[in-house]
Amino acid sequence: MIRFNSDYTEGCHTAILEKLVETNMEQTAGYGEDEYCGQARELIRKACGDERVDVHFLVGGTQTNVTVISAALKHYQGVITAKTGHINIHETGALEACGHKCLCIETPDGKLTARQIAAYTDAHFADESFEHMVQPKMVYISNPTEIGTIYKKAELEAIYQVCKKRGLYLFMDGARLGYGLMCKENDLTLSDITANTDVFYIGGTKVGALFGEAVVIRNEELKKDFRYNIKQRGGMLAKGRLLGIQFLTLFEENRYFDISAHAARLAEKLKDELTKMGVKFYIDSPTNQQFPILPDAVLAELKKKYSFAYQERMDETHSAVRFCTCWATKEENVDMGSEEHTSELQSPMYLVC
């Protein structure tokens, strides 16, 4: 079985595993206060182009989102998000469980715009009964989005300016950030993201680590007592050096960016080969998530050899599905022009669809 259903089906990059074994019997301080976390923080600060940012290591994406958002908001405040945002659809109501509402906006491509954010916020405060409604205080975006689209530099800058003008915090979920940064259409750098958000995180779980995310905080208001929130929300690891070692290894020798570029390249190859076969796509994604629309009969055949995620039924006989490449994907697994793959994709039942 070849798994394309997510980008965390393998363990971790070999260099990380080797470093974990090498340091296994060392004694270090706990809870992220060890030398490896310190070294990793310095490498991340350098990559972000800002020595003033705080860097914290948390165990996973949901814990990170809940910790960041709950640390920033008062109990009567909520967070603006695309309706397809991860915090709204894929975190089991974790944010609502700690008392904060997702204020959802419909989007055609998973991306919020500066105009939408301004309109939503202005409409809230224009209502005479605004104090009877949840107050928008933070904007949540993810890059890439849940459907693989990315924010361009001009879009992010415009969103951040709207947020600053209206007193909103801007938070970027970067669970797949490496894959967004290294795709061909991207024009953002880590420095750009640092300068145009209040807080964001660099995903490790989906980009070569066993587990873990690195939160980068630029806004001084959000730095105070953040570690209290990490502990309270279940994101703090006693053996914190396991996180530090992983991010130290990822940010050495350009490794994080190189392995992300590998995934982006193979996703582009997969997309190109399917396009040549006449396959249409649910969305034009430049990143490691691709969403082909295929006949259900073809999908039934593909399931015998491959796993992938269901996205949406398009009509009575076709469905959109998600294929993810990752840092560990093998070249031959995305070679849809090979004899092994064309037997399923170029069958008569496909060609007449």
Task: Provide a role label for each language-model segment.
Residues 75-76, 268-339:
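Conserved C-terminal alpha-helix-loop-beta "cap" of PLP-dependent enzymes
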